[in-house]
Amino acid sequence: MIDPLLEIMRLLRDPDDGCEWDQVQTFSTIAPYTIEEAYEVADAIERDDMVALRDELGDLLLQVVFHSQIAADSGKFDFQDVVTAICDKMTRRHPHIFGEAEESPGWEQLKAGEREQSGQASALDGVALALPALLRAQKIQKRAARVGFDWPDKAPVKDKLLEELEEVAAASSDEEVHEEIGDLLFSAVNLARHYKVDAERALADATEKFTKRFNLVEASLDKNMQEMSIEELEAEWQKAKASLAAG
């Protein structure tokens, strides 16, 4: 069933009779669309909208086909190579299912083998630079922890977070503030990991909670927020918080 889509993309990229827009696209120019489509898949899942999920998965699949066709046009690889590579990877990572090994190697052993094959020396190699910063921090910390570079429990992680907060307060220049805020955020992600909390999900939930409360405050006011004191705004905020908590 994938063949019709592959043919559509081949025709769109045809140098003579294809679509002018599709013809000139590169990996770099469509990369933002690939990221956007992945987020739209996640959004459809979050909204439990199966019709939208079906459509968004199709859009994401199109991105895979598009990148594969761009690669095929320059002789690098094609869609079948992509499929073969992921099939090989999944088979390699599940020898207890697809192989004859009685005891499967550990996950890190498998990943280390893959990194060696791809020329990656560090346990942190291969974590995509294009990931959202919060998600990339989580992945980097998990990678480091898997090879033993981690605090033994939550207590020193909490201490580190407080230490970073103090360093933010002590910063004396914009550059120092920038750096220390980054360290503070990184430490907060690390604390979330030690509590087995997905920091990305937790921040998304907190942002949505703020949005609901703010919308309620906004709807209840009969004057501009800029005309109100911080005490008045805090009072309205607490009302909105109580209202939402009561259901």
Task: Name each region found by the language model.
Residues M1-E56, L62-I181, L185-G247:
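Flexible "arm" and connector segments at domain edges
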